[in-house]
Amino acid sequence: MRRIPLLFLLAALTAINVIPQSGRRITQPASPPPTAPIQPPLNPQPEVRSAPRPLTALMTLPESLRERPIKAIGADNFRLADFEGKVLVINLWASWCGPCRREIPEYERVRKEFAGKDVVFIGLTTEDPRYEGERVQRFLRDVSFGFRLGWADNEMARTLTNGRRSIPQTLVVNPEGRIISHWDGYAVGWSGKRLTQAIEQALTRE
């Protein structure tokens, strides 16, 4: 008769030992999440509904920049100097930039409005073709972007943005090579209007 209580005691001790071990296994903290990816070197400006913010622009395009070869996307390489005597619209963008994607349709409408005029529309991505080539190609398959497209190397991006590390940015250059307008960000309903006004100003500038 004495063996029965002893067996019950052993069973109870075993249960007490197993339950906390089992609990520890269930509540063991999960592994920490993977490290967040490194952010792109330029930051997308948030979308707004007021006029785009003007930037302090360079007075003229430097000679070194105009003569600098630009690696084209899907076409022959070119230089800004190739379009001397024409109005230049230069848009800096990236495939990961949401405001850039939403800005493109407005700019495309403007480009079509000035078809046949002495206006050249150039879109330069700030991404690195060695690492981002496939992503940029996928982006361009999803959007209608009729600009002459190319890759802005670090020196060109730094000079065109005048040191401000944000995109999208847009510059309008008159036929004499003077930058008459420069702004960053995408403003819903405003960016296209502002671009139209800047181009008209550049075309009529004496």
Model-assigned labels for residue ranges:
Residues 27, 31, 38-80:
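N-terminal "domain-start" segment that seeds a small globular fold
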Residues 118-133, 145-154:
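Thiol-based oxidoreductase modules, predominantly thioredoxin-like and allied folds used
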Residues 92-109:
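Conserved redox-active cysteine motifs that mediate thiol-disulfide chemistry
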Residues 169-206:
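Thiol-/selenol-based redox modules, centered on thioredoxin-like
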Residues 86-88, 92-96, 128, 166:
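Short pre-active-site segment immediately N-terminal to redox-active cysteine/selenocysteine motifs
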Residues 137-169, 173-175:
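Short, internal strand/loop/helix patches
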Residues 1-23:
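Sec-dependent N-terminal signal peptides
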